[in-house]
Amino acid sequence: MSNITMKELLEAGVHFGHQTKRWNPKMKPYIFGARNGIYIIDLQKTVRLFKSAYNFVFEAAQAGETMLFVGTKKQAQDSVAEEAQRCGMFFVNDRWLGGMLTNFSTVKQSIERLKRIDAMFADGTIEAYTKKEALQMEKERVKLEKTLGGIKGMNKLPGLLFVIDPKNEEIAVSEAKKLGIPVVAIVDTNCDPDNIDYVIPGNDDAIRAIRLLTSKVADAMIEGGQARNTQLQTDTEGAEFAAGEETGEGTVAEA
């Protein structure tokens, strides 16, 4: 089971919060102190709370739930896309479209449009269109891919969200809250932790800090998925064995 150490957190700069003049008083329980006008996050609490978040994500994956990674700020974009893809999950790393969760049926129509255009370019159907029409479709495809590419395979609402900087992603958090979708988030000293189900206190601006925490959350999804597959395989083998036993008993009785 993946773990996170104090050394890893320190090396990645997870303990550095925002300037003391830019803070949310609700984050006070997670703050160790201040140094040179910067709040220092209590990493002992980060370790403990990360463990709770990890266990939750692991259990969700084990139960077959899907997760949506959300991080549209520049520092988070690469980590969000890479780690979501590594664990076979979905992501939004460009712009959160209002209604992406609360109006998912409409968003799905745009996803289907993107898939259709992709298919046209893949099978050569696009050649039946004029050069101008093909160019317009390519522009539409690029635009849709940028905003919806990370959720192209998401056929239903996710079971949970992992968010980097809930202050920046407040619309996503609000939509998840309305729908009762649990939120796990990296929460810095300037954020409101109230709408977050699993708070991970930490630096949400440094690329190294974001990458470390995001990769560990992806590990939880992978390990939970592996545990699910093992359990399903065990259940299948058990059912096959039981069926074989029944067949064997019938043969003996007939003999």
From Swiss-Prot:
**InterPro entries found in the cross-reference section:** Ribosomal_uS2 (IPR001865), Ribosomal_uS2_bac/mit/plastid (IPR005706), Ribosomal_uS2_CS (IPR018130), Ribosomal_uS2_flav_dom_sf (IPR023591)
- Gene3D superfamilies, alphabetized: Glucose-6-phosphate isomerase like protein, domain 1, Helix hairpin bin
Q: Which UniProt keywords apply?
A: Ribonucleoprotein, Ribosomal protein
Recorded superkingdom: Bacteria
Q: Keyword Ribonucleoprotein: yes or no?
A: yes
A single Gene Ontology biological process assigned to it is: translation
Molecular functions (GO terms): structural constituent of ribosome
- Name of the protein in its database record: Small ribosomal subunit protein uS2
| SUPFAM superfamilies in UniProt | Ribosomal protein S2
One Pfam family name is: Ribosomal_S2
Q: Which species does the entry assign this protein to?
A: Geotalea daltonii (strain DSM 22248 / JCM 15807 / FRC-32) (Geobacter daltonii)
What does the similarity note say?
A: Belongs to the universal ribosomal protein uS2 family.
Task: Reply yes or no: does the keyword Ribonucleoprotein apply.
Answer: yes
Output the PROSITE patterns linked to this UniProt entry: RIBOSOMAL_S2_1, RIBOSOMAL_S2_2
Recorded GO CC terms = cytosolic small ribosomal subunit
